Amino acid sequence: MSEQLTFHFEVDGDNFTSAGQASVMMKKNLRQLGISPDTIRRVSIAMYEGEINMVIHAGGGAADVTVDEEGVKIVLEDQGPGIKDIEQAMQEGFSTAPDNIRSLGFGAGMGLPNMKRYTDTMEIESTPGVGTRITMRVNF
């Protein structure tokens, strides 16, 4: 691929019905581009986890995805409450999701750890009261 392709998705907040639509659409786009199934799987998992986090914690946000010769870059950005302690939030099982969200089967504290696990690089910038920006990359 000699060119760079970009995709933009809005993520609705507090809407579990539409949660995951961006990752499903991106999965289709990557298949059409002939990207390997393993890369598609990794991108889909990381994006889905990020979307769910934006729905649960931030009232929505945006996902911007760039596909270039080297891989897939995913930028998730929201204007939610921010992450107070990123190191703690990265611990498997740590969650600030309320009980009503947990009763739906979400909020198990695996979102951020899974995002890191399935990407080659992940960087989190967050300011409490302002929002969060997560940049991930999955290399080919």
Question: Where are the predicted features?
Answer:
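Conserved beta-strand-loop-beta-strand hairpin that lines the nucleotide-binding pocket
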Residues: 1-9, 51-140
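Bergerat-fold GHKL ATPase/HATPase_c domain
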Residues: 1-45
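Short acidic amphipathic alpha-helix that forms the conserved interface helix of the HATPase_c
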Residues: 44-48, 52
